[in-house]
Amino acid sequence: MSATFLLVSTLSLAGATENTSLINPEGATWTLHPHYEIGTLAPITHRIQLGQAGTDFNFIADGGQDNLFQFQRFEMWFQKNGRHHLGFLLQPCDLRTTTEAYKELQFDSVVFAKDTPMEFRYGFDYYRATYMYDWRQGTKETLSFGMAMQIRNATLDFRSLNGELQNTNRDIGPVPLLAAAGKFERENNQWWGFDAAGSFAPIKYINGSNTDIVGAILDASIRGGLHLQQGADAFVNLRYIGGGAEGTDNTPDRGKDGYVLNWLNFVTLSVGFEFQ
């Protein structure tokens, strides 16, 4: 309800009479730029295997992810003199599904018999701090490049609905990324933009792990929008979120051999707003 209220309130600014920013004083050295998206997430592909003897599990075909999920994205950007961009992102991702095991399933050392009613949770929230330098400073357009540090907060649960069997995995780790973004003007108060952050890391420490696990991530979008009044912009956004990891951790949890394979491709469609 609060997200809907914020979006409606922002769109209502189209009827305002002033063109000055609603939140930033004219000529300020530092300016604040909130960004919010709400929409739907569609898993396109999603595979996972936990343990060398574990099942190569298809979340979409066998795990109930053949559906649409709610999507939200929260960002706050600070700009110094319009050139230095410092951003903070909260990206929730918590996919919970229920189905029955169509065949015997094994995750690490836990085995679920065929036809077991199952509950799955794939939680992969991430938090990101980004610095970018704008090469189009002094114009209404932006073209920025920089680096980011992302913190993954993963929670993977596989359990029987009767509570007798469960496999759970937790992981928190840093992931360095390269980042880019742009925003370009069109006619009649229209604009389009993009953002992207990603990395490919086959080497330990670079991928936020202490072992040679291959990891990759790409979070990229393209959007089109309208300039409203008082520095508000509304837009429609198409986003791709993909990546994963494969390898063996040399310090596994007790009862596990440390092997993990996890690759996914998600697409989101959202509407949103931001303030200049």
Residue ranges and their predicted role:
Residues H33-G39, G87-Q91, S144-Q150, D195-S199, ...:
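Transmembrane beta-strands of outer-membrane beta-barrel proteins
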Residues I172-E187, D195-I203, S209-N210, A216-L218:
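A contiguous pocket-lining binding segment that forms or flanks enzyme active sites
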